[in-house]
UniProtKB/Swiss-Prot annotation:
Protein name per Swiss-Prot or TrEMBL: Ribosomal RNA large subunit methyltransferase K/L
Family: Belongs to the methyltransferase superfamily. RlmKL family.
Entry's EC annotation: 2.1.1.173, 2.1.1.264
UniProt xrefs under PANTHER family: RIBOSOMAL RNA LARGE SUBUNIT METHYLTRANSFERASE K/L, RIBOSOMAL RNA LARGE SUBUNIT METHYLTRANSFERASE K_L
Single GO cellular component term: cytoplasm
Compartments where found: Cytoplasm
SUPFAM superfamilies: S-adenosyl-L-methionine-dependent methyltransferases
InterPro entries to which the protein is assigned, alphabetical: 23SrRNA_methyltr_KL, DNA_methylase_N6_adenine_CS, RlmKL-like_Mtase, RlmL_1st, SAM-dep_methyl-trfase, SAM-dependent_MTases_sf, THUMP_dom
UniProt keyword terms in alphabetical order: Cytoplasm, Methyltransferase, RNA-binding, rRNA processing, S-adenosyl-L-methionine, Transferase
Gene field: rlmL
Coiled coil: none
Secretion signal, residue range per the UniProt entry: none
A GO MF term: 23S rRNA (guanine(2445)-N(2))-methyltransferase activity
Organism lineage: Bacteria, Pseudomonadati, Pseudomonadota, Gammaproteobacteria, Pseudomonadales
Class of enzymatic activity (EC top level): transferase
Length: 730
């Protein structure tokens, strides 16, 4: 075999230039960058050194051969031509990895099979010995990459991916791979800061990946020093003496690094379940003297190095996945920015994020940004210098005259990030509405009401108050609106709401309203199960702001519920499409002789049962799980007061066909009116904006539209929110 080899090093997308720089420093020559990889030339000692020292590579591949191919036979022949006896014993084990497609190879499994067959056929001897496949821990791992008709055949010297350092056996919900964490640290300038004796703190450290990688860089510890099994361990071309030399050098450097006074490296994590796993990872890495992890919230983050040294604050905030997370993430970033401005003056900061637009909400100008990929997710690394001249809040200070004490230049109180002009206008509108509607709500003893409903077209939101919580619904923007501008306006609004209303950011819940299909509007969106009790007209009701698109209480129907409460005394009440039966609770409060509530959803009937029980109402209030149309066709009871508030559109596995309120309302009302007792009243309402009541109904029944009477002041701005009718028998 030659003394010089072509090496191919793979890495996460976006790390190519960093890896090229690192590999050059470790001795790789003739370096060229490719997508998610680099290549170059090196001797065996450099190959070993890259394996043990690369903080950024996934794999180190030793290229055996490059050859062109047009079909599967060319693939077989090219692999078979290699003298495999130089690499693998006849009775050894191998694994084959194949990537790419073309030249008649459209299936990677088929390609890997052809490579394996060529190797096995080459090594099969007269005694019948032949290599076998071992996917987990083979003697050699062969890799073939097919790229535009060229096959690149390699041996994987690394074995398992080099990002698997061996210390992180316990991880959190959204782990950052170790080599990506190392790349972020390098881009953030940690090697320079560490060389100067600086500190490092992570306010959301999870299980400590940034902390361990930072300590290994600072202590000059090779990231894969503790790896026991390599891709070259059983390779026949392995040179043990050369490997021992490289490994011993790395061992000596690690011992020297650990003998130095440790730097101040600290992590803080709010989730108590991650504290011990993080500490276990630190101990496995042998860095217990260098790294400490404590439980702590971002809101109380305040690094205090023992010698008052400055350094780097680094963080990978969580990514929002659930309904409503966008609001909580916005406030998390704002909180992080506030803590940096208040407690980390003079430090540098690095935020690795999948939501870079939220970085603008931190109140500090980012002086440099780098693009990365976390798997398939595009991310940005935002770098900050925590200095007053970089602040974009009310905290920016005028230049101090010479001789002024340094402490006077440090902000002593955290102020919110400065609102944009548009956000300030939005905040002013909220405060104006609050002043007007708040008086009415207090007078009527109403806990929950709509404060804002797209009053300003550019801020297409509905903002509802539920006691001291805010429920925000974003209306889907038309396709003609630039999504980036719509997103920026949403973030402006979310920043303004806590300031305008004087509430905690943690009490703002965001949801996105768009055209719903089928039962999607009733699907569970999260699993927090957080119910809270609210009051309406002397009735206690349960709402859930987080788990579903709707909250369990349709605020626009408040006047209708109050009307039902006033009219229900001594009557038999029927509530069709009852949802969480809030109207039923009002009827019971008003003295109804009996109530019957029908809905197809078990979830909402369980909720209805809780609403009734919360008010002390017994089983005489019947709850029926059924398709409303089917139930009406089979029911023969009479009712004095009926309320129907159907969805615009509905389907379910439990019902036959699809309900369409425009198409089916005549049949629905005829069935319901057949159950109405003489002198009784049926109230019919729906929220379909294009709805037209069939004129034939007016010939059969006494019909009166009462839409204007069913709107309270909080919905007066949107008189098309619903339409309502009062029907009686002729």
């Amino acid at each position: 075999m030659s003394d010089r080899f072509e090496l191919y090093l793979t890495c996460p997308k976006g790390l190519e230039s960093l890896l090229a720089e690192e590999a050059k420093g470790l001795g790789l020559d003739e370096v060229r960058e490719h997508t998610s990889a680099i290549r170059g030339a090196a001797d065996m000692e450099t190959a070993y050194r890259l394996c043990v020292w690369s903080r950024l590579a996934n794999r180190v591949l030793l290229v055996l051969k490059r050859f062109s191919m047009k079909n599967a036979d060319d693939l077989y022949d090219g692999v078979h031509a290699v003298d495999w006896a130089d690499h693998l014993a006849a009775d050894g084990t191998l694994a084959v990895e194949f990537s790419g497609h073309g030249s008649g190879i459209d299936n990677t499994h088929f390609g890997a099979l052809k490579v394996k067959d060529a190797i096995v056929d080459k090594l099969r001897n007269r005694e019948g010995l032949r290599p076998s496949v071992e996917k987990i821990d083979p003697d050699v791992r062969v890799h073939l990459r097919l790229d535009r008709g060229e096959a690149i055949l390699s041996l994987d010297l690394s074995g398992h991916s080099l990002h698997q350092r061996g210390y992180r056996l316990q991880q959190g919900a959204a782990p950052l791979k170790e080599n990506l964490a190392a790349a972020v640290l390098i881009r953030a300038g940690w090697p320079r800061i560490a060389a100067e004796g600086g500190a490092l703190a992570d306010p959301m450290c999870g299980v400590g990946t940034f902390l361990v990688e930072a300590a290994m860089i600072a202590a000059d510890i090779a990231p894969n020093l503790k790896r026991e099994r390599w891709g070259f361990s059983a390779w026949l071309g392995h040179v043990p003496a050369l490997w021992r030399k490289v490994h011993d050098e790395a061992q000596a450097r690690a011992q020297a690094g650990l003998a130095k006074p440790p730097l101040w490296i600290r992590g803080y994590e709010a989730d108590p379940r991650l504290i011990q796993p993080g500490r276990n990872n630190v101990e496995r890495a042998g860095l217990g003297d260098w790294v400490k992890i404590y439980q702590g919230e971002v809101s109380t983050f305040e690094p205090r190095p023992d010698q008052n040294q400055k350094g780097l604050v680094i963080s990978n905030p969580p990514y929002g996945e659930r309904l409503g997370d966008e609001a909580s993430l916005l406030y998390l970033y704002q909180n992080l920015g506030e803590r940096l401005r208040q407690a980390c003056m003079g430090w540098e900061a690095a935020v690795f994020t999948g939501a870079p637009q939220l970085g603008k909400r931190m109140g500090i100008r980012s002086h440099k940004q780098y693009a990365f990929w976390n798997g398939a997710l595009p991310c940005k690394l935002l770098l900050f210098k925590v200095q007053p001249d970089q602040f974009v809040t009310g905290e920016r200070r005028e230049a101090q005259p010479e001789g002024t004490e340094a402490r006077q230049q440090v902000p002593q109180a955290s102020e919110p990030a400065r609102l944009s002009e548009g956000a300030q206008m939005f905040a002013n509108r909220l405060q104006k509405n609050l002043k007007q509607l708040g008086k009415w709500a207090r007078r009527e003893q109403i806990d929950c009401y709509r404060l804002y409903d797209a009053d300003m077209p550019e801020y297409a939101l509905a903002v509802d108050l539920y006691q001291d919580w805010v429920h925000v619904q974003e209306y889907a923007a038309p396709r003609s609106v630039d999504p980036d501008k719509a997103q920026a306006r949403l973030l402006d609004a979310l920043a303004a709401i806590p300031q305008a209303l004087g509430i905690s950011p943690q009490r703002v819940v965001l949801k996105r309203r768009e055209r719903q299909s089928g039962t999607r509007q009733y699907e569970r969106q999260a699993t927090e199960g957080r119910f809270q009790e609210v009051n309406e007209g002397g009735v206690k009701l349960l709402v859930n702001l987080t788990d579903y698109l709707d909250t369990g209480l349709f605020l626009d129907h408040r006047p209708m519920r109050m009307r039902i409460q006033r009219e229900a005394a001594g009557k038999r009440f029927l509530n069709l499409f009852c949802y969480t039966a809030t109207a039923t609770v009002h009827a019971a409060k008003g003295g109804a002789r009996s109530t019957t509530s029908v809905d197809l959803s078990k979830t909402y009937l369980d909720w209805a049962r809780r609403n009734l029980a919360l008010n002390g109402y017994s089983e005489r209030n019947r709850l029926e799980q059924s398709d409303v149309m089917t139930w009406l066709e089979g029911n023969r009871d009479s009712y004095d007061l009926i309320f129907i508030d159907p969805p615009t559109f509905s389907n379910s596995k439990r019902m036959e066909g699809v309900f369409d309120v425009q198409r089916d309302h005549v049949q629905l009302l005829d069935l319901a009116m057949a159950r109405l007792a003489p002198g009784g009243v049926l109230y019919f309402s729906n929220n379909f904006r294009k709805f037209q009541l069939d004129e034939h109904l007016m010939a059969r029944y006494v019909v009166e539209e009462i839409s204007a009477q069913t709107l309270d002041p909080d919905f007066a701005r949107n008189n098309r929110i619903h339409r309502a009718w009062r029907l009686q028998l002729r």
